[in-house]
Amino acid sequence: MFPKQEYFVGNIMDYYIQKGMVDEGLAQINKLLATSETPYYLYVKGILLYEKKQYDDAVAIFNKIISNNGDLVAEAYSKIGDCYFFPAQIIVEENAKLAIDDPKYNENENKIKELYEKAKPYYEKAKELKPDNKALWGNYLLNIYWKLNRAEYDSLEKELGY
């Protein structure tokens, strides 16, 4: 029997992720969701989908948490931001290997900005809901503001005490 306590579910799902057994984790969390659709179980499912890089499906799950307006709303906003931010980081790393005059460089820069623009309101909402939980939004917004709006970057840098 699979445990139902959130603590155990979270630890088991972390194990599945570390071992590359995300599909097994999804199968288990779907069974739990069939009996009890809690914000925590939904959040875990969203994380598993995120780990599989099924970002649209993950966003749909996180939006369900937000629309239910219960627990983990700020965290769900942050994870939606992650669904745009981290794919952008892959492109940032790719661009670091390209010459600035490479046509692909500008194309990538535009993609990065587009993904950052999508991520930004979700991190800002997480900040609004949980201003003291900087792990949800702090460094992500700093990176985004650095790329998109230096004035916001300077202001946030001061706020974070850097």
Language-model features, listed with the residues they occupy:
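Short coil/linker segments at helix-helix boundaries
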Residues: 86-122
